[in-house]
Structure formats: C-alpha cells, structure tokens
C-alpha cells in the first residue's frame, strides 16, 4: 500500500487540526505540493483529492463565510473554462473509474490555468492554491462528480453494501491496491 503514506499524512493532519482550520491548511500545503511532485503516482488524483475535500469540509468549511459552493457551468463559462463533458452513467467498474479520473484530471489542469487567469489566484502553485476560494470551488465541483461516480460504482459492484461514497473509496484503497494510483 504505497499510497498509505499520503493517506496517513492526511489522516494525521486532520486529527491533529480538527479544531484548527488554519493549521489544517498550513499542514496541507506541503502535503499537496509533495503529492504533485511525486514522480510516479502512488495515490490517484480522485482518491487523494476526495480525502482532501472531505477533511476540508469537516475542518475548514464550517467557519468560512460565505460558504464555498462548487463552481457551476455558468461560472466556468464566465472564466473562459470549457465544460467538463463525460458520461458518468456507465461508470460501474474500476477501469471506468480510472478512465474517469484520468479525464477529469486532464480537464482540471486546464481549468486551474483558466481559473487562475480569470481570478488572479495562484491556481498553478500547489503550495499556495489551497488557501484560495477558487481552488475549493473547483475541487468541490470535481468531488461532487466523484461522489456520484463512487456511489454508482458501489451500488453496481457491491449492491446495497456501502454506507457512503467515502466508504466505497476507502474500500478501493484497502482492497484494490493496483487501482489506487489510477483512480
């Protein structure tokens, strides 16, 4: 479980900063940067970021006003960011989750550039971007799609078994190690 290093760092950080939103963001900065700089990916794009978004939502988001909402199609259009077009309806196998992860990561990279240009935030710097609302709006949008895909995969692969989409993600991390770098 090579991905466990990042997963454990995130879990330890979340536990240590559960009542310290600024501490969470400060601690996330080097972890996020290290994940981006990793030569050979050990923890997939969607699995890493869904955990990051989950901890952000628990620790930081409750104190943020106004609340951080996911970007909408109109928001993307207004910033000159092309829409993410992918048919999630047929995502019901690990290979399809991996394909979805690859597709949305590619789109996300372009979105980071466009959002950075439109908003003036350092979206291309993983040490800094986590301190800015546009980063979280983008990743909330992506995570909403991933949660939908995970729920669908979980229901089709293991009908009526998982309690939450995050439980499905944790199952993949625990039982399908070979897929973790790709999802």
Please tell me what each predicted stretch does.
Residues 1-183:
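C-terminal accessory segments of proteins
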């Amino acid at each position: 479980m090579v991905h466990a290093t990042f997963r454990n760092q995130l879990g330890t950080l979340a536990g240590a900063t559960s009542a310290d939103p600024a501490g969470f963001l400060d601690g996330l900065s080097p972890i996020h940067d290290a994940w981006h700089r990793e030569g050979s990916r050990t923890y997939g794009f969607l699995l890493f970021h869904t955990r990051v978004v989950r901890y952000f939502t628990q620790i930081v988001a409750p104190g943020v006003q106004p609340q951080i909402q996911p970007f909408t199609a109109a928001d993307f259009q207004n910033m000159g960011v092309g829409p993410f077009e992918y048919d999630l309806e047929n995502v019901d196998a690990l290979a399809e989750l991996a394909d979805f992860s690859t597709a949305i990561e590619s789109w996300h990279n372009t979105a980071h550039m466009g959002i950075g240009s439109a908003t003036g935030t350092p979206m291309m710097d993983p040490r800094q971007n986590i301190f800015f609302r546009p980063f979280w709006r983008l990743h909330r949008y992506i995570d909403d799609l991933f949660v939908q895909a995970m729920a669908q995969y979980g229901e089709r692969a293991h009908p009526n078994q998982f309690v939450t989409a995050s439980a499905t993600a944790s199952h993949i991390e625990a039982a399908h190690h070979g897929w973790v770098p790709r999802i």
